[in-house]
Amino acid sequence: MHRRYFWLAVALAVLIVSATGYILAGNYLYAQYQTSLSSYTASCGALISWNPPTRLYTGLYVNAPSLVTIRYRSQTRQTLHISLSIPQFTKEDSADVTATSSFQQRAFKPQVLGSAALDALVGPGHSVAQLHLQVRSLNKVLCDTSASITLFSRQIMHWSDASGEDNSAYLAGWVTPNAPVIKDLVGRAAKRLDASPASYPATKAMHGYDAGRATPDDVRGQVDALLDTLQFDYGLHYGSDNIPFTPDATQLIQLPADILTQKAPIGMCVETTAILASAVERLGMFPYIIIVPGHAFLGVALDANSSAIDYWETSDLNGQTGSQANVDGQSEFRGSQNPRVIDIQYERQHGILPIE
């Protein structure tokens, strides 16, 4: 009899512990659910919830996967037409969805109207706009609301957000091989080759990897010619500036066209590197942007297999030749510790395209 009571007591204790654990786990999961739900801003009753951004860095946005995620539901099953736009900056992104009593979600990314919409922000630096959301049923508007959003110029690089997420891969968007100014740069470099063949003995033309026939010295000569053309034909000067690495840091970075159309062009390290990388990519070669604390410089694969990479230091635009910039770039890379390497070809394959 005593043994029976003992095992009953043990069983009861196990049940109590299990029930307590179940309740605690349930409370934790419910708290997590409430935390997740509270990150969204409810609007239009219980139909829609969203968490609209308050800032939009347009230079990054053109390559971002989405702008905002809309959560939707309906007490009765029905088709909803959801549309999102930033008037005078984007087109409308819309979708027809089937709403049920459970929340579902969809990401939206309205397409920018065009380069003129991006360029309009360059002068003022930023502008306050409205993010417009509308939800319709088959016969009426169910929800129409807006949220203020600050649009920042395409020249503003947001290196990392408040959570510390690294945005440096988006710098590949500043590499613009199809820009008319880059076509002009390559053409003027070709003229420099013709006018000064002794300065580039291994290079006969600006032909990239020349279907695998270009030697490493041929490739080096082409990059040297580009750098010399920037310095001696365009009068481009190097301006010192530090790349910030603190959370939520921003920096003004001009596109190649912004700089090369100036009467007295000047560019900091990341800007001059992006100009050269643009020309290198236009030639069908593979550029890299190397980022170390406070600085950036150029890397170029010496063949189509990227079996070897050489480096160029654009701070040498203040008086040194392209060949010396190559020497100094090699030295810079050897002395760097844990550099951030942005492989432009890789980023293209993963959806980071030129801003223009």
Question: Where do the protein language model's features map onto the residues?
Answer:
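Hydrophobic membrane-insertion alpha-helices, especially the h-region
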Residues: L8-I23
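Beta-sheet-dominated interaction scaffolds and their linkers
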Residues: Y28-R71
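Alpha-helical and coiled-coil interaction segments, frequently adjacent to or embedded
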Residues: T69-R71, I82-P87, K91-E92, N139, ...
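Short solvent-exposed strand-capping/beta-turn motif centered on an Asx-Ser/Thr pair
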Residues: R71-R77
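Intrinsically disordered, low-complexity Pro/Gly/Ser/Thr-rich segments with frequent PxxP/GP/PP motifs
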Residues: H81-V128, R136-L142
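Short beta-strand elements
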Residues: N139-P177
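Secondary-structure boundary elements
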Residues: G173-A264, S306
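Hydrophobic/aromatic-rich core segments of domains that either
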Residues: I266-Q345
